[in-house]
Amino acid sequence: MKIVYITGCLGFMGSYATRMALQRGWYVYGVDKVTYAANPKLLDEFNKYENFRFIRRDIKNLKFLNDCDYVINYAAES
C-alpha cells in the first residue's frame, strides 16, 4: 500500500487528490490548516475511509513526516 501526505487536503485541488488516492487504496495523511480556503465538510467523506488520517496543522509546523512514498503539496491560499 502506498503512503502519501497530502497538504491542503480540504481545499479545491487537494481534496481531489485526496479522493483519488483514497479510491486507489492508498493510505492518506491529509494535512490542512483549515483556513477560509478549506471545506471542513469534506472530512465527513474522507473519514469514511479506514486508510485516512487527518492532521490539522500548518505545514510550517510539521516537525517530521513518517515513512511515506509521496508528499503532494496543495497547501496555498489565493
Predicted regions located by residue number:
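N-terminal Rossmann-like NAD(P)+-binding domain of SDR-like oxidoreductases, especially those catalyzing
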Residues: 1-78
